[in-house]
Amino acid sequence: MEYEAERAEFRQAFEAAGIGRRVKRGDCWWPVRLGRSYYNAMDRLVVEVFRTEDLDIEHNFEYGKPVCFFSQTDGAVQLLPWTATVSYAEDERMVIVLPNEGVLSQLGSIERLGVGLGFDESTYRLMFQALDAVMTAREGRLAHLRDICHGGVRAQRSAAPAVPVSLPWLNAAQQEAVREVLRARDVMVVHGPPGTGKTTTLVEAVCEVLRREPQVMVCAQSNTAVDWISSQLADRGIGVLRIGNPTRVTESMLAHTYEHRFSAHPDYPALWSIRRNIRQLYSTPRKSRSRDFHQKVARLRERADELELRIRHSLFDNARVIASTLAGAAHPLLGGQHYHTLFIDEAAQALEAASWIAIQKADRVVFAGDHRQLPPTVKSRAAQTGGLAESL
């Protein structure tokens, strides 16, 4: 219901605003000219798009944003029934990742083509997948955590920590909360009204857990919340690796993003050189290519893949905290990753379905937040009535 409500709201707003108004806001290019299409270094099909009018208007397109193509016939706007993603955007040119080869011919058949910022369905898709996994789980940690969170099974606690915890800079309630986090085998909730030091307590809990575990995951519903708790941990000297779209990360956390760390890695210049060689090979006219062209490209790609994997493993091996939004926990970089402990900050503002995206990757989860503060944002009244506004 919420998905359909948001999708309908976007479509109505897109059509009601009119193309001219959206162009002036920088949310739309119309008309556009298609440039070349090719497979990029990540082996994704992309197409170049050039705007031909209103070149002086500053636009809002940037890396990672979803976009939708449309046509206009007799004043009526027709949205194409699929979304694409911005790979690169400059003043008059944009490179867009397409979902498949079939849509390319569809774009070429439209006379007056336009492109605008689109409705981001990716988070809903991830939530649907997470809910399906949770509901169908019959055994294992996911099924166990589901049964605990929904009251079917009691959460278990360990005995007192083997190493006594003394944190004199915390008050008695905060110290006890940290101890309870260490004792929790399955689920723990750290809650309290504003001003009680939840963030301070959570930071200390993460630090204490890291004395016992090599790595933890820290998530929140919003990028702002993730960056806040991550910055507090980074200030303590803890190695944080921030996963997510760098354009949505606060300036203070940019140096901790995967992309920044990747490009700063000692092996990156060698990888960049190999990728440049691949691009140069592809820039050679087809008639001038040598017989072993494909073998050369294959060898270079194999070396590039090996280097990229080595850099990735190095970054993850050296990080103590992996930080992302709840939806960001499904990032391809985190595929196959699993953590003993997951911390979810501002948990009262998190949609339950979004929480399960991250919980799938953990053996136990620590929720932190205040259930008396703002609930998750839900636009559909029917969805609110159905319980979507209730967080875990």
Where are these predicted regions, by residue range?
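Conserved RecA-like ASCE P-loop NTPase motor core of nucleic-acid helicases/translocases
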Residues: T196, T201, A205-A234, V240-G244
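Pre-ATPase regulatory/linker segments immediately N-terminal to the P-loop/RecA-like helicase/translocase core
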Residues: E58-R179, D235, S252-R276, Q280
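The Walker A (P-loop) glycine that initiates the GxxxxGKT/S ATP-binding motif of P-loop NTPases
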Residues: G192, N245, E346
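A helicase ATPase "motif cassette" and its flanking acidic/Ser/Thr-rich regulatory loops
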Residues: M1-Y63, M94
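Phosphate-binding P-loop
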Residues: W169-L170, V178-V187, V209
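Pre-Walker A (Motif I) flank of P-loop NTPase domains
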Residues: A173, A184-V190, E213-P214, R320
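Conserved helicase NTPase catalytic core signature
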Residues: P161-L167, L254-H340
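Conserved helicase motor core of SF1/SF2 NTP-dependent helicases
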Residues: R212-P214, S222, R236, H313, ...
